[in-house]
Amino acid sequence: MTINDNDILSTAKADPDKGFRLIMDKYGEAVYWHIRRLVSAHADAQDATQETFVRLFRTMDKYRGDCSLTSWVYRIATNEALRLIGRRKESDVRLDTRAPEVCRLAADGYVDYTDLEAVKLQEAILALPTRQQLAFNLRYYDELAYDDIACIIGSTAAAAKANYHLAKEKIIEYMNSND
C-alpha cells in the first residue's frame, strides 16, 4: 500500500517525526537517484541526499502547497545537488578538458563501464546546460509531468517542455556522433 501525499502531510502536522519517516520511505530512493544523475558520484549523491532530508525535516512546516509534495521534495533535492556542484566547481582546478562530472563518472566504482552506450548517455546528459539536464532527468527518468518539472526548476511548463526537447535533441546528436 502506498500512502498518498495528503496523508503524509497530515501525519507530519500531527507527528513530525513519523511524517518525516513517511517522506523518507516514499521519496528516499527516488531522491538519491535524482541527485546521483546530477552529481555523478555515489558518495556525493549520498551526502546530498542526506542534506536534502535534513533540510526537508527542518522546513516541513513551511510547505505551502503551491506545488505537489513530490515537486517540493525534488526542488529541495535539486537545490542540494546544485549547491554541491557549485561548491565543487569553485574548488576544481583541471587540466582535463572534460566536464568535472564526466571525470567523476569515470572514477566512480559504482558505474558499469561494460555498457558503453549507458556511459555515453551519461556523458551526454552531464554535458547539457543545467536546466536542460534537470528537465531531461526529471522527465525521462522520473517521468514527472511538465507542470511538476516547472515547479522544481522554477520555470513554466512550456519552458520545461522546451528544455526537455532541446536536451533530447542534443543527446541524440551526441549519441550518434563518433566520439
Question: Where are the model-predicted features located?
Answer:
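Internal acidic/polar
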Residues: 2-5, 91-121
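Arg/Lys-rich amphipathic alpha helix in sigma70-family domain 2
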Residues: 61-65, 75-95
